[in-house]
Amino acid sequence: LIMIDAAIEAGEPIEEIINELIELGAIDAIVGMHLSAVRQRLSKMVRQRIPYIYTPLYEGGETTPGLFAIGETPQEQLGPAMAMLQQAFRPRKWALIGNDYVWPRSSHSFAKTCLKQMNVDLAMECYVPFGLPSMTGLVDRLEASGADAVLVSLVGQDAVNFNRVFGRRGLHKSILRLSCALEENGLMACGEGNLERLFSVSSYFGSISTDANACFKERYYAMHGEIGPALNALGQSTYEGLHYLSVLLRDFGDIWRGRSTQDGLPVIHESGRSFERNGKKERPSIYLARADGVQFCDFKLL
């Protein structure tokens, strides 16, 4: 097992590294938990030489042969979450804030369609580079926009920094927050006092009470003990990706070369997530959760 840091800020020449490993026969598959921007670059280089499992939530529409994206899409996740919050809180205007790359832009394009269907106004749409030195100006713009709700599609430390400034400003009193990518570790980093009226939508939360998660947690804590890293959607997706890869190769042999995400191969694999049948496919159950301190609670099945 070779671990490679594919984070943008790591500055690694990821395409060169992976290409060299493939050519040397040093790797037989990729299980990737990284940004969609990295996936798009790698998919052009891998070219079906080895199977590529992409594990986190993403913007949808992946059709590259030999690449299997197993995470949820905005249609499954974002749309139902916005609809539930709109019904519960009746915000008159939404703001859309994200990092400047394909996943936030594609997700926000879908969000704008949802807002139009719900007859709700868009107060602000803004994209910022990774590693923005200060979130103060962005939060200033949000506060002045008149938005009652904000979809936060910032990732990593940018999401943490935004929520800290937002919380210190006390904007939760007038603006609710929704995130599709804030998990348990990010929640702890934001700080307990900065998380009021913050909602997250995901197919997995570490504390959710399902049979699948109970089995997963039992195995996890048996191996790592109670001091193991907090269970979260991104970590679970990597675990699931390895099991998906194993079953894909065991049950389907080399058929993966001509197949892709859209083909919906019946790969029945171990997961901490629960699944529901949607037509001929099984898709993950999606939940909306509310931050309570540095934990998620009040899970609603969407």
Specify the residue positions occupied by each region the protein language model found.
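An alpha-beta-alpha
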Residues: 71-126
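Segments of small-molecule ligand-sensing domains
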Residues: 222-235, 246-300
